[in-house]
């Protein structure tokens, strides 16, 4: 887990700053799912850090089999949009069918359901 100090983006020595400044860094995931074989569509949610997904999301997509699956990123953000998120995630899992993501800040449950249904 990340502490408040880990997430202090104003401190260039914080854990999140160090991770995001090294694009090759891949934090470990405690436990990956056994299989995603029963799913055709995968939603992946995360906060936007520095206009992209945190590098742990790259860890995830590089270590699960998403080939041929529709992958839909969604995010929260303190002020930016999706930025270069999709461009940064695609090389980590080129076999997935990536769909343009969406920032979902403040969306009502109905608006979120409507968005997901259209995908």
State each model region's role.
Residues 40-42, 67-72, 98-99:
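Short, surface-exposed connector motifs at secondary-structure boundaries
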Residues 43, 66, 77-79:
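Short glycine/serine/threonine-biased micro-segments
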Residues 47-52, 77-81:
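Gly/Ser/Thr-rich loops at beta-strand to alpha-helix junctions
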């Amino acid at each position: 887990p990340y502490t408040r100090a880990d997430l202090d983006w104003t401190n260039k020595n914080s854990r999140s700053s160090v991770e995001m400044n090294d694009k090759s860094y891949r934090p470990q995931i405690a436990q990956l799912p056994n299989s995603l074989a029963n799913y055709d569509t995968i939603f992946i949610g995360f906060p936007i850090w520095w206009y992209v997904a945190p590098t742990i999301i790259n860890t995830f997509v590089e270590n699960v089999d998403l080939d041929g699956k529709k992958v839909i990123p969604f995010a929260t953000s303190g002020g930016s949009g999706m930025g270069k998120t999709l461009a940064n995630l695609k090389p980590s899992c080129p076999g997935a069918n990536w769909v343009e993501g969406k920032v979902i800040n403040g969306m009502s449950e109905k608006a979120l359901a409507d968005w997901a249904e259209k995908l």
